[in-house]
């Protein structure tokens, strides 16, 4: 067995990851070590796009989740870092298959955007600043806790009723 790319990154830098023989193409095709379901970004992407095409899931959560990780990856590691964070670990699996769970994700479009951004933010905070190299599952769980509050905020915003008139006013 060998270290996973995120494990190597947690103890070094992007140079260490690429010096250990991991290439972006290896990450994309799944020619690296890792847990089942997190190694082939290509296979997960095909499966996720199929679910979107069949309208089983909405694209809002996966797109905002992955885009948030990409933007924060640009900030903390440049373009190579952004691609690495998207292709390594369980991000693609979490974005397409876990975060889109009907029961634990928001129902309204604005809520889905907030949920996806929150998942991406927590994922990157855990990956960059915590001692645990993978943060996707924890990020999704944290956002699942916040889902009722996100739904409540978005529901009030979307279905806002007009203010009641004061007595004597029409």
Question: What is each model feature region?
Answer:
Residues 1-45:
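Long hydrophobic alpha-helical segments that form multi-pass transmembrane helix bundles
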Residues 30-37, 79-84, 107, 131-132:
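Interfacial loop-to-helix junctions that mark the boundaries of transmembrane helices
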Residues 43-52, 65-74, 93-98, 119-127, ...:
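Hydrophobic core segments of alpha-helical transmembrane domains in multi-pass membrane transport
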Residues 52-63, 102-113:
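Membrane-helix interface "capping/anchor" motifs
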Residues 62, 83-91, 111-115, 131-143:
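Loop-to-transmembrane alpha-helix initiation sites
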Residues 106-107, 112, 116-129:
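Divalent-cation-assisted or electrostatically stabilized phosphate/pyrophosphate-binding catalytic cores
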């Amino acid at each position: 067995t060998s270290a996973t790319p995120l494990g190597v990154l947690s103890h070094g830098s992007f140079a260490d990851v690429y010096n250990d023989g991991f290439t972006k193409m290896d990450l994309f095709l799944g020619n690296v070590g890792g847990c089942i379901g997190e190694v082939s970004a290509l296979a997960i992407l095909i499966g996720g796009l199929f679910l979107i095409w069949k309208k089983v899931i909405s694209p809002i959560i996966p797109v905002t989740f992955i885009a948030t990780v990409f933007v924060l990856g640009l900030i903390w590691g440049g373009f190579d870092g952004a691609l690495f964070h998207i292709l390594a670990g369980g991000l693609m699996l979490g974005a397409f298959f876990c975060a889109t769970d009907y029961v634990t994700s928001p129902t309204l479009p604005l809520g889905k955007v907030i949920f996806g951004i929150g998942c991406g933010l927590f994922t990157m905070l855990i990956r960059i600043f915590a001692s645990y190299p993978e943060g996707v599952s924890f990020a999704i769980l944290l956002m699942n806790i916040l889902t009722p509050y996100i739904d409540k905020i978005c529901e009030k915003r979307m279905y806002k009723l007009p203010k009641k008139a004061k007595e004597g006013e029409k």
